[in-house]
Amino acid sequence: MADGDKAAIQFFRGTDEPVVPDIRLTRSRDGRTGQATFIFEQPEALAPETLGNIAGMWMVDEEGELVTREVNGKFVNGKPSALEATYTWKTEQDFERFMRFAERYAETKGLGYSNNSGNNEGADEASEG
């Protein structure tokens, strides 16, 4: 990550993943705990020329980094096709920190938020505004 005001996701420390994931948020009814699920379709981290094992996902921004070790690969016909990572928070402060990262990441990538049209009872989706 070159710029101090930018946010990036890394599977290998120091190497930004250029593929933008689909991110889904779920929270408990009281809002204290929850998860963000990241799905990367055809990420560069799975490219054949990539060397090394994926030991986690780092979300890096001007405040530091958030880390999850919950990263799983998806294979189709024996070939890697996607990565799914889950970041879990256990306090409102952790959630607020994650959302600050998410806002910076969205700004860096030119993204916005949208509501999920499905019926996820007990789940909150990030929304504009």
Curated annotation (Swiss-Prot):
Membrane association type: Peripheral membrane protein
GO BP annotations listed: photosynthesis
Compartments in which it is found: Cellular thylakoid membrane
Family annotation (InterPro entries): Psb28_c1_sf (IPR038676), PSII_Psb28_class-1 (IPR005610)
Subunit structure: Part of the photosystem II complex.
Family the UniProt entry places it in: Belongs to the Psb28 family.
Protein name: Photosystem II reaction center Psb28 protein
Organism: Synechococcus sp. (strain WH7803)
